[in-house]
């Protein structure tokens, strides 16, 4: 049996871009866990049986949209707090690059995302934590590089 080639959690990177030309991307400090969700919007339609119209119909599904969501949790780092707040305050979506690095290839998505929410929390005597949620704004273009 061949073992799968896997990667570590730190190799899933969430990066925000600046306003330079070309855009320079950097991963804001502080995430200890992150998650990437790829969604497809579907529209249901009943597919009747032409030979037996009274039979129960099967459901067909048509793809209507694609979407990406990114979330992350970790410590609220002084080095990145303003980066996250600036992105959240922006009326416009911000440049974003999401990378998933394996030993032999890297899968990346580049596009624009909105910082949907930032949650900060803390207990007495412990470090302040953060939870951040982002949503795609238009197409996130996928590339694979060896």
How would you describe each model-predicted region?
Residues 2-73, 114-128, 133:
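Solvent-exposed edge beta-strands and adjacent loop segments
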Residues 15, 77-116:
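Short, acidic/charged, Gly/Pro-enriched secondary-structure junctions
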Residues 137-142:
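Hydrophobic lipid-interacting interfaces of membrane-associated proteins
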Residues 144-146:
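Short acidic DE-rich linear segments
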């Amino acid at each position: 049996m061949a073992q799968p080639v896997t990667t570590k959690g730190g190799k899933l990177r969430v990066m925000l871009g600046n306003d330079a030309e070309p855009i320079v991307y950097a991963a804001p400090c502080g995430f200890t866990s992150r998650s990437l969700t790829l969604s497809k919007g579907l529209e249901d339609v009943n597919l009747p049986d032409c030979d037996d119209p009274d039979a129960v119909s099967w459901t067909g599904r048509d793809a209507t949209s694609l979407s990406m969501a990114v979330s992350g949790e970790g410590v609220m780092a002084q080095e990145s707090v303003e980066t996250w707040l600036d992105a959240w305050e922006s009326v416009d979506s911000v440049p974003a690059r999401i990378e998933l690095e394996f030993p032999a290839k890297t899968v990346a998505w580049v596009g624009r995302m909105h910082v949907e929410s930032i949650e900060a929390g803390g207990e007495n005597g412990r470090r302040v934590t953060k939870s951040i949620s982002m949503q795609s704004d238009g197409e996130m273009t996928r590339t694979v590089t060896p």
